[in-house]
Amino acid sequence: MSLQICVMTPDCIFLNKEVDEIILPTNTGQMGVLSNHAPLITALDIGVMLVRTQKDWESVAVMGGFALVKQNQITVLVNEAESKETIDPQEAEEAFATAKQTLEQATGQKEKVEANFAFKRARARYQVIGA
């Protein structure tokens, strides 16, 4: 038995297909979902969502949101989603290096929060390109 996943952003339905397994970046860590999973709703952090079909794994950078798991259907609502095909590897690598440096140099509370947010976004995109 498989899972039906639908990933939606404010702009579009980003992904809608049958999968065998999904790993979600929740606020408390990664959470795997297989068929016949118990119903739940969970908040998603900025990170990499992994989707497995029979053939291989697909990585998607998600920028926070939530997921609903119910009766082998997973509905994922996120602020933004990007796949490997839509990310420029050079730009992602540069953004990751810049965000890391900015986070290390942040001093004030507000500056640290903003730098951490930018770092998490850049890291997710960098991880998706497989660097």
Swiss-Prot record:
GO terms for cellular component: chloroplast thylakoid membrane; proton-transporting ATP synthase complex. Transmembrane segments: none annotated. GO terms for molecular function: ATP binding; proton-transporting ATP synthase activity, rotational mechanism. The keyword Chloroplast applies. It comes from Oltmannsiellopsis viridis (Marine flagellate). PANTHER family: ATP SYNTHASE DELTA/EPSILON CHAIN, ATP SYNTHASE EPSILON CHAIN, CHLOROPLASTIC. This is ATP synthase epsilon chain, chloroplastic. NCBIfam families: ATP_synt_epsi. F-type ATPases have 2 components, CF(1) - the catalytic core - and CF(0) - the membrane proton channel. CF(1) has five subunits: alpha(3), beta(3), gamma(1), delta(1), epsilon(1). CF(0) has three main subunits: a, b and c. It is a peripheral membrane protein. Belongs to the ATPase epsilon chain family. HAMAP family: ATP_synth_epsil_bac (MF_00530). It is found in: Plastid, Chloroplast thylakoid membrane.
